[in-house]
Amino acid sequence: MLKNRNLINADDFNVEEINEILNLAEEIIKSPSDFSNLCNGKILGTLFFEPSTRTRLSFESAIHRLGGDCIGFSESASSSTSKGESLADTIRTVSNYTDIIAMRNPKEGSAVLASSYAEVPLINAGDGGHQHPTQTLTDLLTIWMTKKKLDNMTIGLCGDLKFGRTVHSLIKAMSRYENNKFILISPEELQVPDYIKMFLKSKNIEFKEVEKMEDVIGELDVLYMTRVQKERFFNEADYVRLKDSYILDNDKMKLATEDLAVLHPLPRVNEIATEVDSDPRAVYFKQVRYGVIVRMALILKLLGVR
């Protein structure tokens, strides 16, 4: 049972529980009208201490599509924390207004702290550079709907693998399904952190690090592209030097298999050329829709409605 649970890290739920959410999401895709009033009278609180238009709108769309309502703020300046209120007091207060909370905060560990004070289910909508579990569920649903499986695949992750929290969460999640291996494509300065490599080694999961996408794209079942995130850099010169490191275009797509699935958590800058958008293997805009659907399923499960 997922009722009244929190979702802080991608590994908070076991594989069976994740599959339960994905199966419900697939039901919603097949018959959305059956779910349009299940959260009538329920209120979602969206507490976004860090701007994120897509994630916030996705949560808001999800609760509205379920017949519920939404209250919250989109930046810390709009909250009482700008007046000096502690995160603990904010969470305690909002728990009295809402039935469920989605929170994004730039400080790592803030979601764990918030969950200890929340009196309603709390969803981590992004926690510094550490975890982004609902994006992981979105990615899993996208792969499932596209490939019809979550195991026995070669998954390439490309771009900013150091600061990209979606990458870290996805690697850990896909590692729980059998016989997946990873190809990590990045410049040396943006390689995946050591703790992720140690995690993969501890699980005896095959992975390799490469610098050239074109050398490995033909081996991939899934290619997960990421942008180089300016906001994670302390030095603008480093950002400018690395931001165009990896661009996926039609020439590189010609080297890929016919059933490759290209994902991207968005927003895109220029790491995927717009000419790729019309390629049927590009599923990153479908991924946006799946993000709303999987958040609908998650809300239903945590509220115990389904």
Curated annotation (Swiss-Prot):
GO biological process: 'de novo' pyrimidine nucleobase biosynthetic process; 'de novo' UMP biosynthetic process; amino acid metabolic process
Pfam families in the record: OTCace, OTCace_N
InterPro entries to which the protein is assigned, alphabetical: Asp/Orn_carbamoyltranf_P-bd (IPR006132), Asp/Orn_carbamoylTrfase (IPR006130), Asp/Orn_carbamoylTrfase_sf (IPR036901), Asp_carbamoyltransf (IPR002082), Asp_carbamoyltransf_Asp/Orn-bd (IPR006131)
Binding site for carbamoyl phosphate: R54, T55, R104, H132, Q135, L266, P267
Keyword Transferase part of the UniProt annotation: yes
PROSITE patterns: CARBAMOYLTRANSFERASE
Gene3D superfamilies (UniProt xref): Aspartate/ornithine carbamoyltransferase
EC number: 2.1.3.2
Recorded family membership: Belongs to the aspartate/ornithine carbamoyltransferase superfamily. ATCase family.
PANTHER family xref list: ASPARTATE CARBAMOYLTRANSFERASE, ORNITHINE CARBAMOYLTRANSFERASE, MITOCHONDRIAL
Purpose of the protein: Catalyzes the condensation of carbamoyl phosphate and aspartate to form carbamoyl aspartate and inorganic phosphate, the committed step in the de novo pyrimidine nucleotide biosynthesis pathway.
Subunit structure: Heterododecamer (2C3:3R2) of six catalytic PyrB chains organized as two trimers (C3), and six regulatory PyrI chains organized as three dimers (R2).
Protein name: Aspartate carbamoyltransferase catalytic subunit
Lineage: Bacteria, Bacillati, Bacillota, Tissierellia, Tissierellales
The gene coding this protein: pyrB
